[in-house]
Amino acid sequence: MRTRSAPDDTTAPGRASAAGYLDGQLLVAMPGMADERFARSVIYLCAHSAEGAMGIIVNKPAADLNMPDLLVQLDIIRQDDAIRLPNRVGHMPVLMGGPVESSRGFVLHSPDFHIDQSTLLIDDGICLTATVEILRAIAAGTGPRDAVLALGYAGWQPGQLESEIQANGWLHCPADPDLIFNAALDAKYDRALRAIGIEPAMLSMSAGHA
């Protein structure tokens, strides 16, 4: 998977679906994914058009980084204030969203929070905001009801994702906000497969005998 900037054409979800694009859906890696960075990945596809695609891995933690430490590093809170964060904020995982711009934060969140000119409504249940203001709101307890923070994203060149899907690299299914925001990280892959109608154990057996 080559890295690239996020596509400029963030087509509205309804028109994207009509054109055969998959923004607002989950990509689920097939067993035997050639690129180890994406093995057993579940990716929420934020943008997909003729210009390419951009998504966030939602089931892999960033190495050695938690939310309180990140907020301290960004000077959003002081070290002494970390223990005073709301419980759900203090335990919010920081995800490894993908290999592109891996030092940049992206927040997928519920649509009850919006920043003008910064928040992209991807579908009825999920938005994307990539500014420090949303982290300040989360730290203050005034952010969205549901949110996950990821560092970096996955990007595809024009036509690249379509080719990978045709080569059986990815399955896809409608996104479930509960899976993205509430499921345990290590349960998301199997849960996404079951949403497609595939029992994970059977898929693993089939891959082993391919």
Curated annotation (Swiss-Prot):
Pfam families recorded: DUF179
InterPro entries, alphabetized: AlgH-like (IPR003774)
GO annotation, cellular component aspect: cytosol
Gene3D superfamilies with a match to the protein in the record: VC0467-like
Transmembrane segments: none
Family classification: Belongs to the UPF0301 (AlgH) family.
Protein name: UPF0301 protein M446_6268
Organism: Methylobacterium sp. (strain 4-46)
Species classification: Bacteria, Pseudomonadati, Pseudomonadota, Alphaproteobacteria, Hyphomicrobiales
